[in-house]
Amino acid sequence: IWIYDEKYKEYIKKAKEHGLKLAFRVFFDGGVPQYVYDAGAGRSGSQPYYDDPIFQQKFFKFLDAFAKEYNNPDLVDYVDAYGLGTWGEGHGVTLKNNTDATYKAVIENITGAYAERFSRVLTVMNLSWNDWKFTEESVYKKGILPRRDGIGSYWFNDTERKYLHQLFSEDKLAFIGEGCYWFNDSSNGSKPGYTYDFKNDKRFQMNTMEEALTVSVNDALENHSNTLDLRVPTQCKFWIERLPGEVQKFITNGGYRLYPARIKVDRQGNNMLIQHSWRNYGKGMLPNNHPSWNHKYQLTFSLL
């Protein structure tokens, strides 16, 4: 159980000690407690049947407790509001009643449960061509933000890039980006045996780890990402020691950077008229329209 897991508690403790905000994904592939199955929930291999009412009942009870602990924007940046399938990325979702109607209902039930309980924290969902026919209307039109792993690789394909740009330009949704996981390769690409090594990528030409991570930065910026993680400890160390300029490049240009472009003040008797326009110097977007934020950041002027 999560509240008793020592590794979990240590991660949270260390993050708080270093002043780091938290982000969560709860995934079920191999992660569902045995008591859920003992209660009668069905399964297929390492995954539950996500449309099983017993599974959903147990999960929603967990989610009540989890949200009570973490529905706090001072502690948590965002929460993944889905987590189904392999790696929690929506691949191979297992259903008892394998129909489109059931699939759509499961997506709506899970994301809706997160949205209801995490009312103060940004909610996101992994963007995938596989379930887009459901998620466009049932998830993203409701304000949940797109999140995509595989930035800087061919896994992030042209179809998904098109969807993402639509969500950014038309629906004004900020993008949560995650760099491609190069299998914790600290050998700078010289170690054999990596099936999906960056040298074999079908979209980008990359021969060294420096090139692979630089591609990730550029790809994240081109796709208007608000975030780009430094991944696991080995890659994080590599970033800081070998590519500090690329780290700073994303810090400077990623996300949103709002500055006043023009301010004009006209005094009319006892009244003052302030005309102003602002420019975003970042490639991303302030997610102020997310339902959990509900435009909570408002512009004000102070007269001193």
Where are these regions (language model features)?
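Aromatic-lined substrate-binding rim segments of carbohydrate-active enzymes
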Residues: 1-44, 103-122
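Catalytic cores of secreted or luminal carbohydrate-active enzymes
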Residues: 212-263
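Active-site groove signature of glycoside hydrolases
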Residues: 29, 46-52, 62-100
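Short amphipathic alpha-helices and their capping/turn segments at secondary-structure boundaries
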Residues: 5-18, 63-71, 265-268
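Extended low-complexity, serine/threonine- and proline-enriched intrinsically disordered segments
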Residues: 289-304
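Catalytic-core regions of glycoside hydrolase
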Residues: 16, 80-88, 93-234
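Structural beta-strand segments of beta-rich domains
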Residues: 270-274
